[in-house]
Amino acid sequence: MASLLKSLALFKRAKDKPPLAAGSGGAIRGIKHVIVVPIPGDSSITTRSRLLDRLVKMVGDPDISGPKLTGALISILSLFVESPGQLIQRITDDPDISIKLVEVVQSDKTQSGLTFASRGTSMDDEADRYFTYEEPNDGEERQSYWFENRDIQDIEIQDPEGFNMILATILAQIWILLAKAVTAPDTAAESELRRWVKYTQQRRVIGEFRLDKGWLDTVRNRVAEDLSLRRFMVALILDIKRTPGNKPRIAEMICDIDTYIVEAGLASFILTIKFGIETMYPALGLHEFAGELSTIESLMNLYQQMGELAPYMVILENSIQNKFSAGAYPLLWSYAMGIGVELENSMGGLNFGRSYFDPAYFRLGQEMVRRSAGKVSSNLASELGITEEEARLVSEIAAYTSDDRNNRTSGPKQAQVSFLRTDQGSEAQHSASKKDEARAPQVKKETRTSSKSDKHKEGTDKEPVSSSAMTLIDVDTTLEADTDPLESKKSAEALLRLQAMAGILGDSTLGNDSLRAYNDKDILN
């Protein structure tokens, strides 16, 4: 049996192992297309700022071609380094494109103010065709995207500090787009705006230079559809991370934005480890989880073997990303999601509408959190040197804070997964219907007694009795159907108040000549 388990472990490890780079053939190369990337030909800040101005206007042209747009974005992304050409040549290794670097210098003879550097050959016409676009023949003004503040005419500047701030503002908006461009481009605007506000408050960017929505949409769509552009951006991030010592301010900002980019598309895998395994609840000992725990273990080993590219496998469209999908461990993932929605309010907005989602194991995770609230892990307590008396004190404090948290906030998590509680809801509805049948004769009896005692007030007497009785029944049914322990205390207090009120109103209709005065003290007593 031991040999079988050992063979099983080796089999799972070999199954999830990526293929090794071996064989007699060379690297497979695709049909390449040429990408022209303009780079500054001198160290002048005027040249760089003028090139940045022309490139931003080019990107805002709705009719720009895809390869030209990619080249312009690569040029903008590399403008913050001292030698953009060396950077691009060092980090670019793409089988789909061939990058052609073109040096740009200032010129007074061209319409754009820039020309391509060459030896003895005039490239003014080629530079104008590249940096400018023709107006339509019908005389209408051509639409182009620019900054939201239309008062900004150009961004040419001669001050190095000011140029770095403007460049950082533009680069921040481009890098923020990468976080959601592949996984959720349609719902990315809200999160992108939050990050923009963050960097504005930190004075890393200039708020007045917020780019137009159309400009950002154009870049987001290009990032989503162009794998070569994403490869360059990931390679640039990794190159910045490998740089020793202090980094330029723009480089540090890119690393900060990388925290939102890294592990994009791997939420199922990361959250399963975080909530399903790291919480170490005893439910992990179930036989149903044995196979999936082995799968998670092999995937974690595979993740480590992939090295520094592992967090970007979805952005880079690596085919191995399918192995990390939640469909490979559906029971453990459903269990982890149940734990997550109980521990973190931010998990309540997740979409659980997957075909492999299992509601039973989702509720298992919820119940593990609820019933384990305030308990101390014996293994962890022994490692930390916590005594039994200290563990008991921690349990009491944790139970108190848990009750206080439940009373203060019900949270969005139960509202998001209410459809999963079909069993509890049906049982509560069944018990409520039985109580309705038992109370119905009593309600009818009270109504007949009221009508006999005072016939000339038949309408006025019947109305409060039936209203109070039906109100009591409806409230009982509703509160019994709601078995959420997060609101049990409030529900009990509300039920006592409503029962006392209904009793007062019912007693006033049982033939007494003088109506009983309503007083809050009766409810409190």
From Swiss-Prot:
Cellular compartments annotated: Virion; Host cytoplasm
Region Ncore, annotated ranges: 1-403
Species whose genome carries this gene: Rinderpest virus (strain RBOK)
Region of interest (Disordered), ranges: 403-472
Name used for this protein in its record: Nucleoprotein
This protein's GO CC annotations: helical viral capsid; host cell cytoplasm; ribonucleoprotein complex; viral nucleocapsid
Ranges where the record places region Interaction with the phosphoprotein: 477-505
Extent of Basic and acidic residues compositional bias: 433-464
Region (Ntail): 404-525
Region annotation Homomultimerization: where it falls in the sequence: 1-36, 373-391
RNA packaging and organization of the helical nucleocapsid, as annotated region: 1-375
Function (record text): Forms the helical nucleocapsid (NC) in a ratio of 1 N per 6 ribonucleotides, protecting the genome from nucleases. The nucleocapsid (NC) has a helical structure with either 12.35 or 11.64 N per turn, approximately 20 nm in diameter, with a hollow central cavity approximately 5 nm in diameter. The encapsidated genomic RNA serves as template for transcription and replication; encapsidation by N is coupled to RNA synthesis. Forms the encapsidation complex with the phosphoprotein protein P. Before encapsidation, the newly synthesized free N protein, so-called N0, is chaperoned by P.
Domain text: Ncore is globular and carries regions required for N self-assembly and RNA-binding. Ntail is an intrinsically disordered monomeric domain in the C-terminus.
Positions that bind RNA: 180, 195, 202, 260, 351
Keywords from the named record: Capsid protein, Helical capsid protein, Host cytoplasm, Ribonucleoprotein, RNA-binding, Viral nucleoprotein, Virion
Subunit structure: Homomultimer; forms the nucleocapsid. Binds to viral genomic RNA. N0 interacts (via Ncore) with the phosphoprotein (via N-terminus); this interaction allows P to chaperon N0 to avoid N polymerization before encapsidation. Interacts as N-RNA template with the phosphoprotein (via C-terminus); this interaction positions the polymerase on the template. Interacts with the phosphoprotein; this interaction leads to the formation of membraneless organelles that function as viral replication factories.
One Pfam family of this chain: Paramyxo_ncap
GO molecular function, one term: structural molecule activity
Domain of life, source organism: Viruses
Compositional bias of kind Polar residues: 408-431
Family, as annotated: Belongs to the paramyxoviruses nucleocapsid family.
